[in-house]
Regions:
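A short, well-structured edge-of-sheet supersecondary motif
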Residues: 160-176, 191, 480-495
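Beta-lactamase-like hydrolase cores
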Residues: 152-157, 459-494
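N-terminal type II signal-anchor transmembrane helix
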Residues: 6-178, 383, 474-475
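Solvent-exposed coil/turn segments that connect beta secondary-structure elements
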Residues: 133, 162, 168-173, 180, ...
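Active/ligand-binding-proximal structured segments within catalytic/core domains
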Residues: 190-231
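Non-catalytic, structured segments within soluble enzyme domains
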Residues: 56-59, 64-82, 86, 93-97, ...
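Export/targeting segments at the very N-terminus of extracytoplasmic proteins
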Residues: 174-207, 271-286
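Periplasmic N-terminal gating module of Gram-negative TonB-dependent outer-membrane receptors
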Residues: 120-129, 191-198, 291
Length: 495
């Protein structure tokens, strides 16, 4: 066979050189090839084997090439995963059904789940059962959702950006309502484009790419591959350890549901990515609207340390008020406007610097938002220059923001005082809830995602509170005949 002769001819010089240099014959395999020249039948078998191996190698190389090409195209278009994940997410449903749920799953460690009370639900239910309460209705998960939650992933359903304790009277009127965070964005259109573009420049520049309608917001492939390479390199040299591959979607999962709001292992990062991807494809393969919601949720949910008298600070809106005394509505109005005077430009530069500094402080809030603002000021100045170079902001905004420093509030703004008489009934209800649910404080109780209905009549309670608040007015007391035996003994010194 021509192929066998060709192989033998090619190996002959090599075999001679091998024996000359090494002082011993080649391995039996090569010797076999050499001897195959003399045996026609073996020569034919060898040729057939060579052809078969060559064909296998060609097919394997072609398959690898096709797989590589397919992987690149899928990374660019996300067509396949958007189809599969949206169908999978569509099977993860739940519905309210009478009585306790047979497959209830509760979160355990996430800061969001702890704050809103979801992680404590088993304890709450047990405590209320001991007081004679019973579950009237509870959500029953579909088999797919139950399996997904049972394997430790986070629920793919829309979650509240704002929640708190709400109490109603017998007619459905609000007695008490606590909303945390207090200042939030209710939709994408409320956010100034300047804030959106700045956030994307810092965290996830291609998130809102409208040309890629099926984009998976849970992973940015270039950063992901780079992060994997850096992680592998770090196993050889720890100094080569680079940054992560977090996107806005996975960061939301992290500071809401991951234990202590951190990513401690690769397994936790995978859990964040899968959960974020399923949530993004919940409404179908087209994720553009879901990606806009991610921007809204991130701005409302990012954690920015805490302050005495204010508590934990969640979201850009509350952070502007707590750290700088700036109202979110005013900030939105000014950042959306076109400055027409030096004063308005200066104010826009001031507010933009505050917003930018908060977006940067999210990386290490306790460090950057400490009394010494030097590191945060320096980081903000660097980003102002980079943002202007990238044409995210105008040079005029950059210069106006460079010209100011971050304000320092000695004390965080406090909630407005409420008359004790007006709070008497609601405080009694809240105290009863503290005892029934075994919650530590009003602070924790008011941050639960909890709604309660009472037998109190609000008009009557309001009238009683009004009368009690005026008992220090002599004319009011005398006009209502409240002076006398077993009443007020005198109208003097009522105050």
């Amino acid at each position: 066979m021509p192929v066998a002769r060709l192989i033998a001819a090619e190996l002959s010089p090599f075999s001679e050189r091998w024996e000359k240099v090494m002082g011993q014959p080649m391995s039996w395999r090569l010797s076999f090839l050499w001897r195959a020249r003399k045996t026609p039948r073996v020569r034919e078998r060898l040729a057939f084997r060579v052809l078969r191996v060559s064909s296998t190698l060609v097919v394997t190389a072609a398959s690898i090439g096709m797989l590589g090409w397919g992987a690149v195209m899928e990374a660019r278009s996300a067509f396949l995963q958007s189809t599969l994940l949206s169908r999978w997410a569509g099977t993860m449903t739940f519905e309210l059904a009478p009585g306790p749920s047979p497959n209830a799953r509760f979160p355990e460690d996430g800061p969001y789940d702890q704050r809103l009370g979801y992680a404590q639900l088993p304890n709450f239910v047990g405590a209320l059962n001991e007081r004679g309460y019973a579950i009237e209705r509870q959500a029953v998960s579909s088999p797919t959702l139950a399996w997904f939650l049972g394997h430790g992933f986070y629920g793919p359903y829309p979650q509240k950006d704002q929640a708190g304790l709400t109490l109603y009277d017998r007619a459905g009127a609000v007695l008490h309502q606590a909303s945390y965070p207090a200042a939030i964005y209710h939709g994408f259109d409320e956010i100034p484009p300047l804030v959106v573009n700045t956030l994307l420049f810092i965290e996830d520049r291609h998130l809102l790419d409208e040309s890629d309608v099926h984009r998976d917001p849970a992973v940015e492939w270039q950063r992901f591959v780079l992060a994997v390479g850096q992680r592998l390199a770090a196993t050889i040299d720890p100094r080569l350890r680079g940054g992560g591959a977090s996107t806005l979607a996975t960061q939301i999962e992290k500071f809401r549901h991951s234990p202590r709001g951190r990513t401690d292992a690769i397994g936790e990062k995978s859990r964040q990515m899968v959960s974020a991807a399923l949530l993004a494809y919940l409404d179908g393969p087209d994720t553009l609207e879901a990606r806009k919601r991610i921007v809204v949720t991130y701005l409302n949910a990012t954690t920015l340390a805490s302050r005495s008298g204010f508590g934990e600070i969640i979201g850009i809106g509350d952070a502007l008020a707590a750290w700088f005394g700036t109202d979110l509505a005013e900030a939105n109005r000014i950042l959306k406007s076109l400055p027409d005077t030096p004063a308005t430009l200066a104010r826009q530069g001031q507010i933009y610097r505050e917003v930018l500094s908060l977006l940067l402080a999210e990386r290490r809030p306790a460090y950057y938002l400490r009394p010494d603002r030097g590191p945060l000021e320096a980081l903000t100045d660097r980003y102002l220059d980079w943002l202007a170079e990238a044409r995210v902001i105008d040079a005029s905004v950059r210069d106006a923001a460079h010209a100011v420093r971050l304000p320092v509030l000695q004390e965080a703004p406090k909630a407005p005082n409420v008359c004790c008489a007006a709070k008497k009934a609601t405080d009694a209800l809240r105290t009863e809830l503290l005892d029934a649910l075994d919650v530590a404080s009003f602070y924790n109780l008011d941050r639960l995602d909890l709604t309660g209905f009472s037998t109190i009549d609000l008009p009557t309670e309001t009238r009683v509170s009004e009368i009690l608040s005026r008992l220090n007015e002599p004319d009011f007391v005398e006009a209502h005949h409240l002076v006398g035996y077993h009443l007020l003994h005198t109208i003097r010194n009522l105050k």
